[in-house]
From Swiss-Prot:
The gene is egl-9. It comes from Caenorhabditis elegans. Residues 468-566 form the Fe2OG dioxygenase domain. The keyword Mitochondrion does not apply. GO terms for biological process: cellular response to hypoxia; regulation of protein localization; response to hypoxia. Residues 249-270 have a biased composition (Low complexity). This is Hypoxia-inducible factor prolyl hydroxylase.
Amino acid sequence: MSSAPNDDCEIDKGTPSTASLFTTLMLSQPSSSTAVLQCTYCGSSCTSSQLQTCLFCGTVAYCSKEHQQLDWLTHKMICKSLQTSGMVPSNLMPQAAPAVMAPIPPTVSFDDPALTTSLLLSLQNNPILNQTISNFPPTFSITSKTEPEPSIPIQIPQRISSTSTVPFSSEGSAFKPYRNTHVFNSISSESMSSMCTSHEASLEHMSSASLAMFPTSSTAQSDISRLAQVLSLAGDSPASLALVTTSVPSTASTATIPPPATTTSSATSSGKSETITVGKEKIIQTDDPDIQIIETEGGSKPTVSRTRKRPTPSNSADPKINYKDHNKNVVYSTTLQEHQKHLQNRGLALSIHQAMVLRLRYIAEHVIRSLNEFGWAVVDNFLGSDHYKFTAKEIERLYERGLFSPGQLMEAKHKDEFHIKDIRSDHIYWYDGYDGRAKDAATVRLLISMIDSVIQHFKKRIDHDIGGRSRAMLAIYPGNGTRYVKHVDNPVKDGRCITTIYYCNENWDMATDGGTLRLYPETSMTPMDIDPRADRLVFFWSDRRNPHEVMPVFRHRFAITIWYMDKSERDKALAKGKESDAACASKKENDPTSSSLNSLIGSLLRPRKNPSTHDLSKLDLRLFPSTSSDPALVSAADEDRVDISADFQSTSSLAHPESTDSGVSLSTFNVAHNHMERTTSLQSISDHFRSERSHERRSSTSSDQDLDEGLPPPPSTNPEYYI
């Protein structure tokens, strides 16, 4: 091969293109015996022993490590494109400083059309290559002797016929190699030409002498012609296509350049639909970003329409889900005393009860925003430092009375006892005010009433019409490694829409005690760990948007769970259950072998087993009264109330007798007060909440926005942290 003349080394500024970049990087085969090498960054001539080749692609070389680091910002996009496209040979091993091998492009066989054209498209969309670079030194110059070189086979992907089936795979489909829709969707013909001009100007350092290294055989001319066809399908300009053929010495056979495919882009004024014509196939954009409609036009045949799904990487996230950073979900942690002090500083002298009601409104606003944006919310210091201690004592006292039973599963009838324990090993008790053994659990009743007060403000603020709730489920996880595997609370649409969990575990260490609530939100790429610390209340959607699990527990862990029901979904679930029960009853009646006596004997002889969680939730469901259009919380049962001879207690009744912290206790109660007096005060607070809510419902005429009018802004000194 004759050495390239000097005038050929200076290429026309208007002709370099993706074709020259492709042929220079991938198709040049210089002779290593007479090669004169230069540094890619500074252009200084060096011997092969002084140059350091790129360890990843082997296509560039540098005279020093500093020049390689300075040029990495420019080279890394091409280097990564070569690696991801599979263009780097497998025998390329990292070498510190090759002594004999010159830093020339490795020999690559372009038998795979997908790799060939995907490399072209990746180089065309390279943001670094689209920048105009002036007076950029050449990568390396080559002076070689005249010697024949073998031709490199290039295979061009064939056009898809109208009747062929479109294959799809995660690695690449038949549409991906040479018809990249992202290239044509957002650019017009003018912007395409300007992009090509800018792209061609950025490749001035590529020499046209590299094109003279192609052999002059007819096979090479055919390969170049087919290469030009690929570049035309990839969107290269006609000027750049001419560079591929005119720079090669012509022989008896002349390479012909096929006209570039007609690409037409039209959109309606509203911008909802977009039509792209490539050859005889027309791609119609749809509202769904994953679906396209392709119309193939034939001569006398009718138009054939088909739909196909755009290829997405198998390891990528679901494009339909809007993923968010859930670490930005702030925890509400303002205490009641801090809230009252903030109101007093603003000139609002409110009693402790008024401040508590106002604080519940602020909590509701925080929970509504977090649920609508992230699907879960966390509130700390919900009851207060004294109340949560008595909540834990009451749960432990109920556990010692034998009211708890092992937790069951909805599908427990299909599993053995050991399998159930392996999935769920907690002990639960459905709190019932009619149960005389749980009559002294006054703090639990106060907690339920306060959570109901928060839920009361959800009306017309979320996508569910809350019409009831379940009874409170008191759960204890014994500290012997018990757990609850990953699950969904409501996978079958039984009516539960919001799950609330209250923790009362004092001095909880997540590192040593375990018991973490691990939440898997639908819009989060990573799970969220919520430690069950004392006086923490957690809200999250009960459906498949929030799978969760309880990690192994190594210390007694107390939790109180309440599910709030969507009215329409719950009614449908109950109606479906009644239909199923009626079908089972009619089947038993039609069975001649069954009789009432046999059923009675069978029920007496059948071993009794604990009802499942689903059955208990059906039995213990408390629906809101349906006589009013506004949701009204359940009133306390007669058995839940405590006889109160005196009038409403003072504000000092909020503090427990055992409290010694002056910063928390707001009273001068005598320590000698017994537990019945404390129970009486808590019951009076609960009754006071119900009376205030009833008064608010009577005075309110619209939504919660009326209640928020005239409210002071939330405390600016709210201590916030991230989970």
